[in-house]
């Protein structure tokens, strides 16, 4: 694909608007340029003031990779394009051997021996005594003293907790099992990666793990602001509040009159270089100024991607992270051996609470396939009996009734069965995403999909609304099951949002057990080939301009304004295994110049979705409206750099299977506690057999994972697909009751339900760290398990932050001596 650097070959577009005075030059690293000898792309716009990443790095986090990040990243991108059939990728460990090169192990052993020889005899004696300790009380006391002052946690509750379960402690000079030099390089790189994620979460008002933030603040001058739940004066929930939130007094779509909407801000909107800009006048001209709304700088984003790409293939860092992950797995197995009976006893002491009546959220499920195949079959038969003469379709300008549609297929209600419906995935869909997509068409006919599971059709989505409401009714009847349904916005026309919101409001499709996410399929190449879009920026305008308009002037989109209050965020969906023919860098065409029929890469979609969402979130927060998060499909298949982009930009992800091949990324996802909604039954039919699914491994190591169904229409058989998912996972992997309840609690924590609702479901203190944030009366998760997870995470974070701090203390005298006598000019 042709590239269009902004500095040459194409004149830069001029816009007759005043730039705001607070903008400063980009501070991205020089290696972020698109290619050798080519001028850098003109930065779209940076945040006001210094770049957050540099402002937030008071320490020297430079490593030996810093000057080579761009070259390493480009080489890895090239390999992912040209060598997709490699048996062992450069960023992963082969399954048969934990270490790729035995030479690396030999050199590491030699370094370890050389360091041990230099130890003094008294140090050796002390290390031996520490190793032979059998009583861990002193270690626990030391750990408790080191943790004092890091928060306002109650010491009494902590003392009680320490007596409740058995701990395993590691003593000695080098507790991590690698030489200090390797630990220092790995710690600096991991801390740098966590700072990068914190910066982008703060920029978009998404959440960031509070425990991780607290440890990073020890290394930073000023903490960044991230998304937090704020309690208003009328929202506090008492400790004895009921588990079920109070019912709404009226339907949320009751008042849809424009006169009841918030006022008009009178701001102007225009998309520039792929991002919506907001101006002080409705019709922007040379006399208006730009409203200060931050979004990520493109040059800085590419530089950050290069840093992370170089990080995940660094040999010593890869070995360090692999060792830490193996340690976490072994430590959890030891914890289970020592405390399993205590956890079970703690659960049995709680009255009227078990796995069946704790809150569970299906955090990854598509609305068009949220029903099982028997449910859809019964609904179609019922529609054929009651609405046979209703006009439901237009074929070549001719209206057709439901009777005529089925007569053209030579079918009657009696002929229909689950087998003729043919919507269930089978062995032929494995690694065939095209055949899986065809399963969305009942009886193989796209016309039936349009009639029954589409929101925009001849009957205004009436049938789809009815079947969704039946699914909602089943969820409400179960009380404790909830779902976050995905609805699609394609970006082909500007009125898609209004049609979707009108469908929800007109048919009153709402339930307290359901929240919405909006998925954007990555299908620009299809629309461009059909001539439906002129360039990629037109697709972005169709997706985001209506949202900005509904935020600036809600009365202009009344249904959309009401609907958005129940939308959690955005999802990016499509087949990740499709080859990408382009690498996203500074030489990539801007959205208005992307007119090729090739599809933009995954990172391109994610960056421009994130940039517009960040601007929109700041505007909506100023108005007191609900903000959004980014929760894409990621890591199901395809190249590993999808997970790199999601680590930087996404609050949660769905699938994450490829993390099993990337120990550095898996360790980073653990430290940042990024939510991962996993669907083993879906993966079993498409990409990975059930027994190879990494979910039990992720869970044992402490990653924030939950179970989800993905597509019950294709993969499940029962009326309760989420319970079916839990049931099979428990039987196959022999999960304990505590494991199941922990998965359910994780699903609520990573969901988009409101703070008040979560306070009822999990307890009013659920935002606190550690066991203080757990209420076993509501979650059925023992404080023992929550305390273990919290202490283990704190120990891992302390390991890397203390290594960085110790290196900083050692270099302070040298740096002070250098700066006191300035060198020659």
From Swiss-Prot:
Pathway: Purine metabolism; IMP biosynthesis via salvage pathway; IMP from AMP: step 1/1
Active site positions: 655 (proton acceptor)
CDD domains on file: AMPD (cd01319)
In-chain residues carrying the UniProt-annotated modification Phosphothreonine: 134
Catalytic activity: AMP + H2O + H(+) = IMP + NH4(+)
Positions of post-translational Omega-N-methylarginine modification: 45
GO cellular component terms given for this protein: cytosol
Keywords from the UniProt entry: Disease variant, Hereditary spastic paraplegia, Hydrolase, Metal-binding, Methylation, Neurodegeneration, Nucleotide metabolism, Phosphoprotein, Zinc
Compositionally biased region (Basic residues): 11-21
GO biological process: AMP metabolic process; ATP metabolic process; cholesterol homeostasis; cyclic purine nucleotide metabolic process; energy homeostasis; GTP metabolic process; IMP biosynthetic process; IMP salvage
Tissue specificity: Highly expressed in cerebellum.
Residue list for modification Phosphotyrosine: 91
Amino-acid positions noted as binding substrate in the UniProt annotation, renumbered to this chain: 366, 435-440, 636, 711-714
Summary of subunit composition and partner proteins: Homotetramer.
Family note: Belongs to the metallo-dependent hydrolases superfamily. Adenosine and AMP deaminases family.
Protein name: AMP deaminase 2
Organism encoding this protein: Homo sapiens
Name of the gene encoding the protein in the UniProt record: AMPD2
């Amino acid at each position: 694909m042709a590239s269009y650097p902004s500095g040459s070959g194409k004149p830069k577009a001029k816009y007759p608007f005043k730039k705001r005075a607070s903008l400063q030059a980009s501070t991205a690293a020089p290696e972020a340029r698109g290619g050798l000898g080519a001028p850098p792309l003109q930065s779209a716009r940076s945040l006001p003031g210094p770049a957050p990443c540099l402002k937030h790095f008071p320490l020297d986090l430079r490593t030996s990779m810093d000057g080579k990040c761009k070259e390493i990243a480009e080489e890895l991108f090239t390999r992912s394009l040209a060598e997709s059939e490699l048996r062992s990728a450069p960023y992963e460990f082969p399954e048969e051997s934990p270490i790729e090169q035995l030479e690396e192990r030999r050199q590491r052993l030699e370094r370890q021996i050389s360091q041990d020889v230099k130890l003094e005899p008294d140090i050796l004696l002390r290390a031996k005594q520490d190793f032979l300790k059998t009583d861990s009380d002193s270690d626990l006391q030391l750990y408790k003293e080191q943790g004092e002052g890091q928060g306002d946690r109650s010491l009494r509750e902590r003392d009680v907790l320490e007596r409740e379960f058995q701990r395993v402690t590691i003593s000695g000079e080098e507790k991590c099992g690698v030489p200090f030099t390797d630990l220092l390089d790995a710690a600096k790189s991991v801390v740098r990666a966590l700072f990068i994620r914190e910066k982008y979460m703060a920029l978009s008002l998404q959440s960031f793990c509070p425990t991780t933030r607290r440890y990073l603040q020890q290394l930073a001058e000023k903490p960044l602001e991230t998304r937090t739940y704020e309690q208003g004066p009328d929202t506090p929930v008492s400790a004895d509040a009921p588990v079920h939130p109070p019912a709404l007094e009226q339907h949320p779509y009751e008042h849809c009159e424009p006169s009841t909407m918030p006022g008009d801000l009178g701001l102007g909107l225009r998309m520039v270089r792929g991002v919506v800009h907001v101006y002080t006048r409705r019709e922007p001209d040379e006399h208006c100024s730009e409203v200060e709304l931050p979004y990520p700088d493109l040059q800085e984003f590419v530089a950050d991607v290069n840093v992370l790409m170089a990080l995940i293939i660094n040999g010593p860092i890869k070995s360090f992270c692999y060792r830490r992950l193996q340690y976490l797995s072994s430590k959890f197995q030891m914890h289970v051996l020592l405390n399993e009976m205590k956890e079970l006893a703690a659960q049995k002491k709680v009255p009227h609470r078990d796995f069946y009546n704790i809150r569970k959220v299906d955090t990854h499920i598509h609305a068009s396939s949220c029903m099982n195949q028997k449910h859809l079959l019964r609904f179609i038969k019922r529609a054929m009996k009651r609405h046979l003469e209703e006009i439901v379709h237009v074929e070549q300008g001719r209206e057709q009734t439901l009777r005529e549609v089925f007569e053209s297929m030579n079918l009657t209600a009696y002929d229909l069965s689950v087998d003729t419906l043919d919507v269930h995935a089978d062995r032929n869909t494995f690694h065939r995403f095209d055949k899986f997509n065809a399963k969305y068409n009942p009886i193989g006919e796209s016309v039936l999909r349009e009639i029954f599971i589409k929101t925009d059709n001849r009957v205004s989505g009436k049938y789809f609304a009815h079947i969704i409401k039946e699914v909602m009714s089943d969820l409400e009847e179960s009380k404790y099951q909830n779902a976050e349904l995905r609805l699609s916005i394609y970006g082909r026309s500007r009125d898609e949002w209004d049609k979707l919101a009108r469908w929800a409001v007109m048919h009153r499709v709402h339930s307290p057990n359901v929240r919405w996410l909006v998925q954007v399929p990555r299908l620009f190449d299809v629309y461009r080939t059909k001539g439906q879009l002129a360039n990629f920026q037109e697709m972005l305008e169709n997706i985001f301009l209506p949202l900005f308009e509904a935020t600036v002037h809600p009365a202009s989109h009344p249904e959309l304004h009401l609907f958005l209050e129940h939308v959690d965020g955005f999802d990016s969906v499509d087949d990740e295994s499709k080859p990408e023919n382009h690498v996203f860098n500074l030489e990539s065409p801007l959205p208005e110049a992307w007119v090729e029929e090739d599809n933009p890469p995954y990172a391109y979609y994610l960056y421009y979705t994130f940039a517009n969402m960040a601007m929109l979130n700041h505007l909506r927060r100023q108005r007191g409206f609900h903000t959004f998060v980014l929760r894409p499909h990621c890591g199901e298949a395809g190249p590993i750099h999808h997970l790199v982009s999601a680590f930087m930009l996404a609050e949660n992800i769905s699938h994450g299977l490829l993390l099993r091949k990337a120990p550095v990324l898996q360790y980073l996802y653990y430290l940042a506690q990024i939510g991962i909604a996993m669907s083993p039954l879906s993966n079993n039919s498409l990409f990975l057999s059930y027994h190879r699914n990494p979910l039990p491994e992720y869970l044992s190591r402490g990653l924030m994972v939950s179970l989800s169904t993905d597509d019950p229409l294709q993969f499940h058989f029962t009326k309760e697909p989420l319970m079916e998912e839990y049931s099979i996972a428990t039987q196959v992997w022999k999960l304990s009751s505590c494991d199941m309840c922990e998965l359910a609690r994780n699903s609520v924590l990573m969901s988009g339900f409101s703070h008040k609702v979560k306070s009822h479901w999990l307890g009013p203190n659920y935002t606190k760290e550690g066991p203080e944030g757990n209420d076993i009366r509501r979650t059925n998760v023992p404080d023992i398990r929550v305390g273990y997870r919290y202490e283990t995470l704190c120990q891992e974070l302390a390991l890397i932050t203390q290594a960085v701090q110790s290196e900083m203390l050692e270099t302070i005298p040298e740096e002070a001596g250098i700066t006191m006598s300035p060198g020659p000019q």
